[in-house]
Amino acid sequence: MSLFDWFADRRKGQYVGNVKQEPEEGDGLWSKCPECGLVVYLKDLRLNASVCAGCGYHHRIDSSERLALIADPESFQPLNEHLAPIDPLGFKDRRAYADRLRESQSATGLNDGVVTGLCRVDGIGMGLAVMDFRFMGGSMGSVVGEKITRLVEECTKRKLPLLIVCASGGARMQEGMLSLMQMAKISGALERHREAELLYLPLLTHPTTGGVTASFAMLGDLILAEPKALIGFAGRRVIEQTLREKLPDNFQTAEYLQDHGFVDTIIPRTQFRSTLASLLRLHGSKSLELTNA
């Protein structure tokens, strides 16, 4: 038997399907900035609050990452975790609303699109709500509205300041009027919080649109935003078609809204925690143990 025949016999006896493909060494280790194209080690990116070191682009982060950046370690006490949405209208478009809910819950590990609770920031007690855009685009349904309302009421009862981190496409259309009424419900709770002379700060992140913008996102004592965040009510294309005019390139950005008086200040994510602590102290908020509040 020649050497060529020996190799041919060896190939016949092999089953290609048994060959195991090794994963790429770099899978999940690197991130490319969509703004400047800089490739960064993912661990280093997260150490910089998911902000690009080259151009300052703010990558989107989930609710757990946001909580870790804002609250003192091990200080966050979640509220109303058990609340979960139902499908009151039996809504179905291309897919059933119930299926969309199950898919989002499985992908995020959350019951709905907001995490609420009490925490400390540099020792100062406060209420904190963080919307998560991964859950159906951060849309506001009845559970999102109820959790935020209960948090506002708890802060009013305990005399605590409040921060809501907004990231939403607006009201959840699959719940119809039940989602729209959350705008008024949250706004009413915030008015009672204001009457108690307590501080409310919304942080507008990318994107903050629709019914969220039209309600609690714009009701703060100071309206804060992240750099280059998309902030608006209707979409750019809808406005252009309605007005029949071309809009500026930076229209509906945080910088544009600040220039026109709708946003008070823009705070880079890497500086937000220290700035928030300063604002709380300026308002007269004091260090306290939340369990004794």
Curated annotation (Swiss-Prot):
Pathway: Lipid metabolism; malonyl-CoA biosynthesis; malonyl-CoA from acetyl-CoA: step 1/1. Its EC number is 2.1.3.15. Binds 1 zinc ion per subunit. Its cofactor is Zn(2+). It is found in: Cytoplasm. One of its GO terms (biological process) is malonyl-CoA biosynthetic process. It catalyses: N(6)-carboxybiotinyl-L-lysyl-[protein] + acetyl-CoA = N(6)-biotinyl-L-lysyl-[protein] + malonyl-CoA. Zn(2+) binds at residues 33, 36, 52, 55. A zinc finger (C4-type) spans 33-55. Keywords: ATP-binding, Cytoplasm, Fatty acid biosynthesis, Fatty acid metabolism, Lipid biosynthesis, Lipid metabolism, Metal-binding, Nucleotide-binding, Transferase, Zinc, Zinc-finger. One of its GO terms (cellular component) is acetyl-CoA carboxylase complex. It comes from the Bacteria. It holds the Pfam family Carboxyl_trans. GO terms for molecular function: acetyl-CoA carboxylase activity; ATP binding; carboxyl- or carbamoyltransferase activity; zinc ion binding. SUPFAM superfamilies: ClpP/crotonase (SSF52096). Residues 29-293 form the CoA carboxyltransferase N-terminal domain. The keyword DNA-binding does not apply. InterPro entries: AcCoA_carboxyl_beta, Acetyl_CoA_COase_Trfase_b_su, ClpP/crotonase-like_dom_sf, COA_CT_N, Znf-ACC. Its main location: cytoplasm. NCBIfam families: accD (TIGR00515). Belongs to the AccD/PCCB family. Acetyl-CoA carboxylase is a heterohexamer composed of biotin carboxyl carrier protein (AccB), biotin carboxylase (AccC) and two subunits each of ACCase subunit alpha (AccA) and ACCase subunit beta (AccD). Component of the acetyl coenzyme A carboxylase (ACC) complex. Biotin carboxylase (BC) catalyzes the carboxylation of biotin on its carrier protein (BCCP) and then the CO(2) group is transferred by the transcarboxylase to acetyl-CoA to form malonyl-CoA. This is Acetyl-coenzyme A carboxylase carboxyl transferase subunit beta. It comes from Synechococcus sp. (strain CC9902). The gene is accD.
